[in-house]
From Swiss-Prot:
Pathway in which the depicted protein is active: Amino-acid biosynthesis; L-leucine biosynthesis; L-leucine from 3-methyl-2-oxobutanoate: step 2/4
UniProt source species: Cytophaga hutchinsonii (strain ATCC 33406 / DSM 1761 / CIP 103989 / NBRC 15051 / NCIMB 9469 / D465)
Residues that coordinate or bind [4Fe-4S] cluster: 346, 406, 409
CDD domains reported for this sequence: IPMI (cd01583)
InterPro entries: 3-IsopropMal_deHydase_lsu, Acnase/IPM_dHydase_lsu_aba_1/3, Acoase/IPM_deHydtase_lsu_aba, Aconitase_4Fe-4S_BS, Aconitase_4Fe-4S_dom, IPM_dehydratase_rel_enz, IPMI_cat
Originating gene: leuC
Subunit and partners: Heterodimer of LeuC and LeuD.
Molecular-function annotations in GO: 3-isopropylmalate dehydratase activity; 4 iron, 4 sulfur cluster binding; metal ion binding
Keyword set, alphabetical order: 4Fe-4S, Amino-acid biosynthesis, Branched-chain amino acid biosynthesis, Iron, Iron-sulfur, Leucine biosynthesis, Lyase, Metal-binding
Protein name: 3-isopropylmalate dehydratase large subunit
Family: Belongs to the aconitase/IPM isomerase family. LeuC type 1 subfamily.
Record EC number: 4.2.1.33
Pfam families: Aconitase
Cofactor: [4Fe-4S] cluster
GO biological process terms, semicolon-separated: L-leucine biosynthetic process
Length: 466
């Protein structure tokens, strides 16, 4: 019987299997940031051991960092402490750190791929839910807890139970105005925020293989939002072209050897998945969430579901979400005013996202009622945006390109949305209070965010495209 992509990568990393228990899995790369690493470093220090393979760990501060004035001391005490502690720990244990001011600093899931740290066939972990981003390269990548961060620092291994496999096949061509973010929001809306629980997802089909690497990262990034352990896409020429020449990519003969191996990383034609779902790209429109989990999503031109259409077991959650958001069952969102637009995060803070946003707003003006946060995912993205003149296009339209960080994706830094206000966000989570106490989040694509930013209200971007 053939093997799935997940099985091939998993089997290549099993050190040993525990009878009737988990496997001990070798971890190729661990990415760390300032929030989930202090306790892990404290743990290995208390035990009197070092980092087993420091060259396989890469650190960068992202969650707590300000997106303006990064040359100045961080104002908030806890944020400053955590960023300083990361620097101290990396220096003490010999871990590579891209600190504030470094040319490669940024959101950890943007930095990994753009530096060539992320490669096909790897196992990659991070104390962060959206580690699944790296699965776009055909790697097994997943988020772990702080105690597991410590395990990997100490041993470069992790005990893991093998997940089931879920194949999500999407064929056809995406319509104008529909992007990768809409694809993943559509899938999550179809299967719910818990529909992927217990599975590792492989995305495939013509609609997936036609996407750029940055678009594929957007899709894999949000795998966790359907409850899945992670998501993967088989590497192909698009993958290889993206990686080639990057700082830590293999060079010379090693590149040829690597590509030869990477070309074996696909699901065999006779591989058996535990579950398969198929979708038609033509059915997907520009998406927007209306509730308090990413599964509460609709095409922007559709109405919020009626209460009668909601399963009995979900009605309490549905009503609670609508009450928090200030919406009603059956409402149309078209025309509703919003207060904030956030472009950024590990989901949509890459150069293609900035290009898409800037191209749309060029020659237009930010609506007067909109507060905008335009945040590149890394210093490299920021540098590229400036080189392309994106900062000037944004400025002429009334927007400001800020410095890199997680920003308004989560309320752990200065970029917070005030209570009761609506933020149209290109990030990955719309939980209660995610962007600030009482903040109301609506998840969208960068293209839809751009349309709303210049309109001041929720619109269907397709009606504004030539």
């Amino acid at each position: 019987m053939g093997k799935t992509l997940f099985e091939k990568v998993w089997n290549a990393h099993v050190v040993t299997e525990v009878k009737d228990g988990p496997s001990i899995l070798y971890i190729d790369k661990q990415l760390i940031h300032e929030v989930t690493s202090p306790q892990a470093f404290a743990g290995i220090e208390k035990r009197g051991i070092g980092v087993f393979r420091p060259e396989r760990t890469l650190a960068t501060p992202d969650h707590n960092v300000p997106t303006k004035g990064q040359n100045l001391p961080i104002v908030e005490d806890l944020s400053r402490f955590q960023v300083d502690k990361l620097t101290e720990n990396c220096n003490k244990f010999g871990v590579t750190l891209y600190g504030l001011g470094h040319a490669s600093q940024g959101v950890v899931h943007v930095v990994g791929p753009e530096t060539g740290t992320t490669l096909p066939g790897m196992t990659i972990v991070c104390g962060d839910s959206h580690t699944s981003t790296h699965g776009a390269f055909g790697s097994i990548a997943f988020g772990i807890g702080t105690s597991e961060v410590e395990q990997v620092l100490a041993t470069q291994c992790l005990m893991q139970t093998k997940a089931k496999t879920l194949k999500i096949e999407i064929n056809g061509k995406l319509a104008k105005g529909v992007t990768a973010k809409d694809v993943i929001l559509y899938v999550i809306a179809q299967i719910s925020a818990a529909g992927g629980t217990g599975y590792f997802v492989e995305y495939c089909g013509s609609a997936i293989t036609s996407l750029s690497m940055e678009a594929r990262m957007t899709i894999c990034n949000m795998s966790i939002e359907m409850g899945a352990r992670g998501g993967m896409i088989a590497p192909d020429e698009t993958t290889f072209n993206y990686i080639k020449g990057r700082e830590f990519a293999p060079k010379g003969a090693k590149w040829d050897e690597a590509v030869a191996y990477w070309k074996t990383l696909y699901s065999d034609s006779d591989a058996v998945f535990d579950k398969t779902l198929k979708y038609d790209a033509a059915d997907i429109g520009p998406m927007i969430t209306y509730g308090t989990n990413p599964g509460m999503g609709i095409s922007v031109n559709k109405n919020i579901p009626s209460l009668d259409s909601i399963e009995e077991s979900n009605k309490v959650t549905f009503n609670k979400a609508l009450d928090y958001m200030g919406f009603h069952a059956g409402d149309s969102l078209i025309g509703k005013q919003v207060n904030w637009v956030f472009l950024g995060s590990c989901t949509n803070g890459r150069i293609e996202d900035l290009r898409q946003f800037a191209e749309f707003v060029k020659g237009k003006q930010k609506a007067a009622n909109i507060n905008a946060l335009i945040v590149p995912g890394s210093k490299q993205v920021e540098k590229q945006a400036i080189a392309e003149g994106i900062d000037k296009v944004l400025a002429e339209a009334g927007f400001e390109l800020r410095e890199p960080g997680c920003s308004a994706c989560l309320a752990m830094n200065e970029d917070k949305v005030p209570k009761g206000e609506y933020c149209v966000s290109t990030s990955n989570r719309n939980f209660e209070g995610r962007q600030g106490p009482g903040a109301r989040t609506l998840l969208v694509s960068p293209l839809t965010a751009a349309a709303i930013a210049v309109s001041g209200k929720i619109v269907d971007v397709r009606e504004m495209l030539n």
